[in-house]
Amino acid sequence: MENTVLFTAEERSLFFQLFKRLRNDSPEMFEGDRYRTLKHHLAVIIGQGRFHRGMFNLNPIIRSMQTAILSAEDIGLKNDSLIACLLMPYITTEEELDDIDRLYGKNVKVILHGLIHIRELYKKSPSVESENFRNLLVSFAEDMRVILIMIADRTNLMRSIKDTTNDEAKLKASEEAAYLYAPLAHKLGLYQIKSELEDLSLKYMNHDAYYLIKNKLNATKKSRDEYIRRFIAPISEMLTQAGFKFHIKGRTKSIHSIWQKMKKQKCGVDGIYDLF
């Protein structure tokens, strides 16, 4: 029988932290009738026994709040999308959408309708890693906010499953993150999220390669930071003298990107010289 404990002590503490953060991200969502409606709606859903931790034993309330926060802070999604994030684990059939339209408006209904379509597409497709599936997914979504929420949810999932004992499910989630969600994030200009998805996928799919590169980067961080500082200094001075307002950034390639170069060039970490 599935564990249906609503909150562990740790989850309860995390819930209040996330609630405060989400309220700061979208204060209008916590004002007036809409918030009271959402609060009551979620309470009814949970009271009906529609609280499922799933194969990774993750609390769906915590997960949906984390996805909403990531959607707001890292992607810039607004109120309607965040409400859809919070309702996403529970609204699974089109029959429920009329109530969503009445309670929250057309935008939330459209987003949840797209998410339901994507779930149906997942069930029908034998392989989600192909370019054809990515194109099909975008067309099924109908609204780009659906794709953005899916990317946010998968990023949140990848952050959350590091301690899971379900290795088969973790591997499948990692493959989908690497071959489906990371390319979608790249196409939409979410480069930091794309790199994070790729790095976490490598961490779970090839633990040894990930930590080989990570440990090497950690060991050489001081010298790399100094190299970047010395490289930027004369450029910064010239731009300042010319009267420009500017900001220069420098960063190391992602672990996944370094690993791809190692495979392509058939060399170790020390054989990769363009780390920046």
Residue locations for each model-derived region?
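Hydrophobic or amphipathic alpha-helical targeting/insertion segments
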Residues: 84-114, 118, 166, 190
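Short, solvent-exposed loop/edge-beta patches enriched in aromatic
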Residues: 72-80, 103-106
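Short N-terminal amphipathic alpha-helices
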Residues: 54, 77-84, 96
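Acidic beta-strand-to-loop metal/phosphate-binding motif
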Residues: 82-86, 150-151
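Glycine-centered helix-coil hinge/cap
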Residues: 31, 104-108, 143, 206
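Nucleic-acid processing machinery
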Residues: 1-26, 44-55, 60-65, 69-76, ...
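N-terminal alpha-helical scaffold/docking segments in eukaryotic complex subunits
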Residues: 13, 29-34, 38
